[in-house]
Amino acid sequence: MSVKIRLKRMGAKKRPYYRIVVMNSTSPRDGRAIEELGYYHLIEKQNQLKIKEDRMKDWISKGAILSDTVKMLLKKNNLNAKSQEV
């Protein structure tokens, strides 16, 4: 089973927000998550990103793969994902 850290879309039509979750790589986008690590509010005046960094480091050390979008969000918000990879 391959595990990924990726975004899960939530919210109403045309008002999305995203949860950063750990999921099986074959699960659908809005499927059941193993664990929720944080959220990303796109519509807010200031894009809000909140992540449980200790849990993310733990999942990366267990072999979880970051999606391209999550990597981009971490880089954009000065949270270096490469330093967390083992």
Curated annotation (Swiss-Prot):
GO BP terms: translation
Residue intervals passing through the bilayer: none
GO molecular function: structural constituent of ribosome
Gene Ontology CC annotations of this record: cytoplasm; small ribosomal subunit
Keyword line: Ribonucleoprotein, Ribosomal protein
Family membership: Belongs to the bacterial ribosomal protein bS16 family.
NCBIfam families: S16 (TIGR00002)
Name listed for the protein in its UniProt record: Small ribosomal subunit protein bS16
Lineage of source species: Bacteria, Pseudomonadati, Spirochaetota, Spirochaetia, Spirochaetales
Originating gene: rpsP
